[in-house]
Amino acid sequence: MSESTLHVRYLGQQDYESVWHAMQEYTDNRDSSSPDQLWIVEHPPVFTQGQAGKSEHILNPGDIPVIQVDRGGQVTYHGPGQLVAYPLINIKRLKIGVRQLVTDIENSIVQMLENYQVKAYAKADAPGVYVDERKVASLGLRIRKGCSFHGLALNVDMDMSPFQRINPCGYAGLEMVQCKQLGGPQTVEEAGEQLVKTFSHNLGYQNLVHHQGLSQSYE
């Protein structure tokens, strides 16, 4: 398998737990020749609590389920109208560390938004992407066997009110913002298409192979 090939899977809207378990399965079963993949998905409303998550940051979940997961970071929200992207990357094979992967992901979002004349930036002390101190994208990864899973969530055109039920990423009073308000991509499909371009460029992938949905083998 060429190290310069990235397989991009478009999953549509999928239940969070089924995609999470599929990511785990792919990571656990992959070997040195397994292709790197980027999964593009939307989830129904769900709060996910990272390994470092504290329960006091979940203020009033109401009817939205809370799932404890095995990624870094604190609590965040996923829902329709949000682009979620999961990079399943063999960072050992790419000879980069997790910090570099985080930087590459953040830069991919920043560069994508720059194409819409939106000035975004990352913060060294608080992973994610921001515009005028408001957070537009959240980030949480897990590395296992030298390979990444979990990923990023970019707010595109969604109901933002569930963020008020939590302290997003563990920060009380953190204001969230979405691309629609900023003049960025207006649909999840558009955002996904643009993110694939900047992400694949930043990670050095020269060939893209596109798939719809998940196959049993993920190949």
Swiss-Prot record:
Keywords: Acyltransferase, Cytoplasm, Transferase. It comes from the Bacteria. The keyword Cytoplasm applies. InterPro entries: aa-tRNA-synth_II/BPL/LPL, BPL_LPL_catalytic, Octanoyltransferase, Octanoyltransferase_CS. The active site is at residue 169. GO terms for molecular function: lipoyl(octanoyl) transferase activity. One of its GO terms (cellular component) is cytoplasm. It is found in: Cytoplasm. The record marks 135 as: Lowers pKa of active site Cys. GO terms for biological process: protein modification process. Residues 32-207 form the BPL/LPL catalytic domain. Its EC number is 2.3.1.181. It is an enzyme of class 2 (transferase). It catalyses: octanoyl-[ACP] + L-lysyl-[protein] = N(6)-octanoyl-L-lysyl-[protein] + holo-[ACP] + H(+). The keyword DNA-binding does not apply. Pathway: Protein modification; protein lipoylation via endogenous pathway; protein N(6)-(lipoyl)lysine from octanoyl-[acyl-carrier-protein]: step 1/2. Pfam families: LplA-B_cat. Substrate binds at residues 71-78, 138-140, 151-153. In the reaction, the free carboxyl group of octanoic acid is attached via an amide linkage to the epsilon-amino group of a specific lysine residue of lipoyl domains of lipoate-dependent enzymes. PANTHER family: LIPOYLTRANSFERASE 2, MITOCHONDRIAL-RELATED (PTHR10993:SF7), OCTANOYLTRANSFERASE (PTHR10993). Belongs to the LipB family. Catalyzes the transfer of endogenously produced octanoic acid from octanoyl-acyl-carrier-protein onto the lipoyl domains of lipoate-dependent enzymes. Lipoyl-ACP can also act as a substrate although octanoyl-ACP is likely to be the physiological substrate. This is Octanoyltransferase. The lineage of its organism: Bacteria, Pseudomonadati, Pseudomonadota, Gammaproteobacteria, Alteromonadales.
